Amino acid sequence: MKQQAKSRKPQQPEYIFQVETLSHEGRGIAHYGSHPDHPADKHGKKVFIRYALPGETVKAQITHEAKRLEEAEMVALLAEPSANRVEAVCPHYGICGGCSMQHIHPDEQIRLKQNVLQSHLQHFAGIQPEQWLEPIRSLQSDYRRRARIGVRYLPKQDRLILGFREHHSNRLTSIHTCSVLDKKLSDSLPELRNLLQSLKGKVHIGHVELAKGDHETSLLVRHIEKLNNADVNQLRQFALHKGWQLYLQPKGPESLRRIDEEQGAMRLHYALNAFDVNFAFSPLDFTQVNATVNEQMVQLACELLQLQQGERVLDLFCGLGNFSLPLARCVGAKGVIVGVEASEEMVQRATDNVKRNNLVQASFFSQDLTKDFSHHSWANQGFDALLIDPPRAGAYEIIQYVPNFGAKRIVYVSCNPATLARDAGVLVQHGYQLKKAAVMDMFTHTEHVESIALFEKIQEIND
């Protein structure tokens, strides 16, 4: 891993360690005392070593010291590598902070993520699912269909950096390729960097965002000062050449404007073909970055809910309708889908998507789900099933209210195993049982753990 050597700090000590196991985020764990050169006063102290794997003997440089543990970075592998070690595919791996597990075999990444979920469920809720489902895997390595890429101009060097932040740093590292970014987007990075370098107002550009629909691509340029007409025209010509939509954003989200309006409305699109639904979205809208995992996830959610024609489903944190529209197909014209989302703009987007797909059985409401919502009409209806897809903070406030919905089945989609486990414990207290769970490799080569879980209401037995 040649990239790592560039970040070594000679003043920091280096030691030899025997790596014992992996932490939840994929770092090797070792202890002082396993080698004669270890300081005696550190005997037994735990060390977390980036890039090291269990069973390996490594030389590592200490990067951070605390009272009970230390952090380090592997600088040399001294013996046979672990069977789970693979060669990182990205030339920027080790400096760029985007990926953290490219050195770990994909199967081991999945196993580690499932262990993380199992551990959190046991620790926070004291439960395990009755059945572990097969993990949902990414079907391609270049899975990311959107990315925010930092821009920084260095006047003294007359050099523009286009790239991602370094690990645990605000410093940008320049990249010319990204192995997890959609290949067409990745291949465009050098050309995009050269374009930005040529602009007079490059010092005013903070970042760019690339987003890809099924058939369209957008380039969004975030700038803090107005760009002159010549710069805007250069950007426009680049977008025309690439066949991309071009957007400028000088301030907040409300300032977003499309420059090449003659090419169409401010929209990208993606489809979930298994459900015959199509979504329109803006470059700033939240969409899942991994298209293949998203489609598998939506299919599994619908299968787990076992929806029947005419049933009523509540979709909480519904966004632009990624689950709502497929659920509407499952319950048919006589069913009811109610979607709730904090963002009024996303509620409007979901409503528009329902109309474009002729799904009259779905309706949407704007509501901050961390606040009291019990007085709203939608909250006082009965539902056969719930789908909950919260942010990392989880859905603790909503979970308290769940018994009032009367749902027999709940599918919880999570991007944080700790908050899923916490909320699962509350659901169990409310009389639900964790039936099935699976991890989803939405963010391959990173420590992020996405998961999906099915809870079913325990039937009460009358005496």
Curated annotation (Swiss-Prot):
It catalyses: uridine(1939) in 23S rRNA + S-adenosyl-L-methionine = 5-methyluridine(1939) in 23S rRNA + S-adenosyl-L-homocysteine + H(+). InterPro entries: 23S_rRNA_MeTrfase_RlmD (IPR001566), MeTrfase_TrmA_AS (IPR030390), NA-bd_OB-fold (IPR012340), SAM-dependent_MTases_sf (IPR029063), TRAM_dom (IPR002792), U5_MeTrfase_fam (IPR010280). It is an enzyme of class 2 (transferase). One of its GO terms (molecular function) is rRNA (uridine-C5-)-methyltransferase activity. S-adenosyl-L-methionine binds at Q288, F317, N322, E341, D368, D389. The active site is at C415 (nucleophile). GO terms for biological process: rRNA base methylation. Its EC number is 2.1.1.190. Gene3D superfamilies: 2.40.50.1070, Nucleic acid-binding proteins, Vaccinia Virus protein VP39. Residues 6-76 form the TRAM domain. It holds the Pfam family TRAM. Catalyzes the formation of 5-methyl-uridine at position 1939 (m5U1939) in 23S rRNA. This is 23S rRNA (uracil(1939)-C(5))-methyltransferase RlmD. It comes from Acinetobacter baumannii (strain SDF). The lineage of its organism: Bacteria, Pseudomonadati, Pseudomonadota, Gammaproteobacteria, Moraxellales. The gene is rlmD.
